[in-house]
Amino acid sequence: MKKNGGSIVNISSYSAKDPSISFPTSSTIKAGLSAFVKLFADQYSKDGIRMNNILPGFIDSFDVSNEVRSMIPMKREGRVDEIENTVVFLLSNKSSYVTGQNIRLDGGLGFSI
């Protein structure tokens, strides 16, 4: 990758920025990954290597209760294809100037907590 450049996309969680007392270890690890992506980008972007994190909220691949759904400003869980489309974009040359980012895909959950 160092020879030809490339893109790395990590799937993290909204809890990287909005930790949950229910999942303290996971939230801490995800926060560490959020910091790491910035350090990695600083070190390797000059070599054409990009790294970004996706921070999904509640996604339809899991059962989401009506109570949780009501907390999401968009009033629905995300779809797997919405995550997929973002990954495809970040791996493509269309995002060639995007690196070191933590991209929330959470239906606005992050700004409502």
Task: Locate each region found by the language model.
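Alpha-helical segment proximal to the catalytic Tyr-Lys
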Residues: D42-K46, S96
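A conserved structural motif in NAD(P)-dependent oxidoreductases
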Residues: I72-I83, K94
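Short C-terminal tail/terminal secondary-structure segment
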Residues: D18, V88, T99-I113
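Active-site "substrate specificity/gating" loop of NAD(P)-dependent dehydrogenases
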Residues: P19-F23, S45, V64
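Residue(s) in the substrate-gating loop at a strand-loop-helix junction
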Residues: S13
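Active-site helix of classical SDR
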Residues: I29, V37
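Helix-to-beta-strand junctions that scaffold the AdoMet/dcAdoMet cofactor pocket
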Residues: M1-N4, S45
